[in-house]
Every structure is written in structure tokens, then in C-alpha cells.
Regions:
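Hydrophobic membrane-insertion alpha-helices, especially the h-region
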Residues: 10-27
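Substrate-binding cleft of secreted/luminal carbohydrate-active enzymes
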Residues: 26-97, 309-394
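N-terminal substrate-binding region of glycoside hydrolase catalytic domains
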Residues: 60-182, 315-318
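Alpha-helical scaffolding within the catalytic cores
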Residues: 96-105, 127-134, 186-189, 251-263, ...
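Glycoside hydrolase catalytic-domain groove-lining segments
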Residues: 131-150, 261-319, 364, 372, ...
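Substrate-binding cleft of extracellular glycoside hydrolase catalytic domains
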Residues: 133-245, 392-393
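Eukaryote-skewed repeat-based solenoidal scaffolds used as protein-protein interaction platforms
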Residues: 194-197, 217-277, 294, 298, ...
Length: 394
């Protein structure tokens, strides 16, 4: 209770300071340029640091101890480009507020997760910059960040950066990226990635062959334009000596022609794919088993010769037994899918990207499902959590 009161006091103080900064900015208006603006920005960053450190403070030593087996491996690029064990990870949409859910999920699985995923869109807003604070916090917790980096091109000041004024900047956007039109942004990301100083996984422009989802897809770009853009981005990172990035290419194999978007072995380290069971939530969906989803894609993706990653694994509850779905999935992984080397749970409890209603994929408080996964990991898998001191997770 005492620690909780301290936390509330710190958070309250940080919030009040943040409000004061905002009001100060409003008062100053255009006069806040120059040194004053820089000072206020620094103060704002300090507020974020205090708040963020407060939210994870006290958990770091226990979680790092439980991930001791991963400590040396997470700084070994050769291991991370083809690990000899399966790396679990998670995305939780509430990470922006805190890592409490992720730490609780560790406890539910009795296995702290080596990878933590965040999503960042391209643009000039604060939340579209390299997520240094989150990356550092993830590393401090003993894990590594996987950043899904989404090349939306709407949030750039086109006049400031001498970009042509167009109705839709995403139309032929990958061609513009390949020509270096957005290097002012990509270079800054590369510099910050290098400054982070640790290995990062980046999933760039995922599901690029899906004509219905994202603007970097075939409705706006040709396959060769996407490839050229991908190769250009990777080369910019190399030119900035950001060799600590591991690149994850993640198509949507449910649509044909995904092979046409492959950037080449020199530019790809991992191949990723989502495995999401929508059940009967929509007229176009049905209850699919894990085998019917991932099993249908496995051989197609394995031919690239790269380690495979399930970047989003989840199932809704409508139309079947979710606990059984996960159990069958994890029971099948070691033998049937040997090239699969990473699985990231998709714990999004407010997903509104597919339907006009919110979907809850999270298994955070699904005790039966977490127990089934935990049992499967420990009884059928030669998996590193067997070596972990899981009783240190609280």
C-alpha cells in the first residue's frame, strides 16, 4: 500500500508538471521557439522518464533474473538470426501506459518473454519517432524489442521537407521511399537505432501483398517498388552503421503473389506471419484450427530458408474452444514446424483494425488458456523456460 501511494504521488506530480508544460507552451505560442523550447522539451522527456521508470521500477531485478538464460544470447546477433530454441514474445496494446499487463502475463505463463512488440507508424509526431524510451524499458526488463514499423506517409509536413503536394501521399509511396524522398526520417530512425546500442527486431511494412489493409500494399505500389523501398531502408541503416537491426519480412500468404515482394536474402533475416483465428465473429470468417492457419502456410514460407516467426498469435472465443485451440497449437510446434523459432502472443483487447467493432484477442486473464499453454511448454517442448527461475516472477 505504501509503494502504491508513492507511485500515485509520483504519477500525480508528473501529470501536473506535464499539464503545466502544456499550458506554458500555449501561453508562449510562437515565442517558445529556440532555447526555451529545447528546455521545455527536455523537461517533458524527464517527466516521461520519471513516469516510465516508476511504472516498471521494482520489477526489473526479478524479471531479469528469471530471464538469465537469455542475458548472453540477446547480445549475440548470430544466435538471434537463427536461435536454437523458440523465443516467445507478446504484444499488449496497453504497453503505452505501462508494462504491468506484460509482467502479469509472465506470471500467468510462469515464463518471462524474451521479445516484446510495439507498433510505430511513420510520421513526425512524437509517437512516430524511434521509441527510445520503450526500447530501453524493454531491454531493462531483460527482453528485446520487436518494432512493427508501418510506412504510412500521411503525417509528414510536405512543404517543410520539399515533398510534392499530392492528394494521396501513399499512392506510389514506396517508389518515393526508394528514391530517398523520406531519408530525412529514415536516417534519424537509423541513428537512434544505433544509439540504442542493443539488438532490435524491425518488422517493416507487414502484409505488403494484402490489397485491402495497408497503403503500402498493391493498391498503391508494384512489388518491385516495395522491394526497392525495403532495400533502400535497410541500406540507409547500414550507411548509418545501425547493424544492430534484425529485419523481419512478414507477408500475408493468404493472398497470392507474396513471393513477388521478397526483398532478397541479403535484406531479410526472418520471415514472419500472423496466425489469428477470427472464429465466427464475421460473415466471412469461420473457426479455423492452428493447423489450418499456420500449417497451411508453413511449407510455403519455409522455402525462403529463414527462421520463421508468428508475429501475431491469437484466437477469439466466438465459435469454438479457445483453450483447446492454443493447446493443440503448442502441442504441435516442436515436431511439425521445426523452422518456427519465435511466437508472439497478440494480447490486444481493443482491436478495431478489421471490423467496425472492437475485438478482444487478449488471453491475459484467461486462466484456463494460460495454464494449457504453460503445461504444453513444459511437457512437450525442449524450451528454455524449463531452466528459468520462474518463481521469481511476482
Amino acid at each position: 500500500m505504501k509503494n502504491k501511494m508513492k507511485r500515485m504521488a509520483f504519477v500525480g506530480g508528473a501529470t501536473l508538471l506535464g499539464i503545466a508544460l502544456v499550458l506554458f507552451f500555449i501561453f508562449l505560442g510562437n515565442r517558445s521557439s529556440g532555447p526555451i523550447s529545447e528546455i521545455l522539451t527536455t523537461l517533458g522527456n524527464k517527466v516521461t522518464d520519471v513516469e516510465h521508470n516508476l511504472l516498471i521500477r521494482g520489477r526489473i531485478p526479478k524479471r531479469v533474473k528469471a530471464l538469465h538464460w537469455f542475458e548472453n544470447k540477446r547480445n549475440n546477433p548470430d544466435f538471434l538470426r537463427y536461435p536454437d530454441t523458440l523465443l516467445l514474445g507478446v504484444y499488449d496494446n496497453n504497453y503505452i501506459k505501462s508494462f504491468d499487463n506484460i509482467i502479469h502475463f509472465d506470471k500467468m505463463l510462469k515464463a518471462p518473454l524474451p521479445l516484446i512488440q510495439v507498433y510505430v507508424a511513420w510520421g513526425e509526431k512524437d509517437n512516430e519517432k524511434f521509441p527510445m524510451l520503450y526500447a530501453k524499458a524493454i531491454y531493462d526488463l531483460g527482453s528485446l524489442p520487436l518494432i512493427t514499423w508501418e510506412p504510412w506517409l500521411n503525417d509528414f509536413d510536405r512543404e517543410k521537407h520539399h515533398l510534392p503536394k499530392v492528394t494521396d501521399p501513399n499512392k506510389n509511396g514506396m517508389k518515393a521511399v526508394a528514391k530517398g524522398k523520406y531519408d530525412f526520417y529514415i536516417e534519424k530512425w537509423a541513428e537512434n537505432a544505433k544509439a540504442f546500442g542493443h539488438i532490435i527486431f524491425i518488422r517493416l511494412g507487414h502484409e505488403m501483398n494484402d490489397p485491402y489493409r495497408y497503403p503500402w500494399g498493391p493498391q498503391n505500389n508494384k512489388p518491385e517498388e516495395f522491394i526497392a523501398a525495403w532495400q533502400h531502408v535497410v541500406q540507409v541503416f547500414k550507411n548509418r552503421n545501425a547493424y544492430n537491426v534484425i529485419w523481419v519480412w512478414a507477408p500475408q500468404p493468404a493472398y497470392l503473389h507474396y513471393k513477388e515482394y521478397y526483398p532478397g536474402n541479403r535484406y531479410v533475416d526472418w520471415v514472419g506471419v500472423a496466425a489469428l483465428n477470427y472464429g465466427t465473429v464475421a460473415p466471412w470468417s469461420k473457426w479455423w484450427s492452428f493447423k489450418e492457419i499456420f500449417g497451411n502456410y508453413y511449407n510455403r514460407l519455409a522455402v525462403f530458408g529463414k527462421p520463421l516467426m508468428i508475429t501475431e498469435m491469437g484466437s477469439l472465443t466466438v465459435g469454438g474452444n479457445r483453450t483447446q485451440w492454443f493447446k493443440q497449437a503448442f502441442d504441435s510446434l516442436p515436431e511439425k514446424y521445426p523452422q518456427l523459432r519465435s511466437v508472439l502472443f497478440f494480447n490486444d483487447n481493443n482491436d478495431n483494425t478489421t471490423l467496425n467493432k472492437s475485438l478482444d484477442w487478449s488471453i491475459l486473464y484467461d486462466t484456463a488458456t494460460c495454464k494449457a499453454i504453460r503445461t504444453s511448454i513444459r511437457t512437450t517442448w525442449k524450451f528454455s523456460p524449463e531452466k528459468q527461475e520462474t518463481d521469481t516472477i511476482r
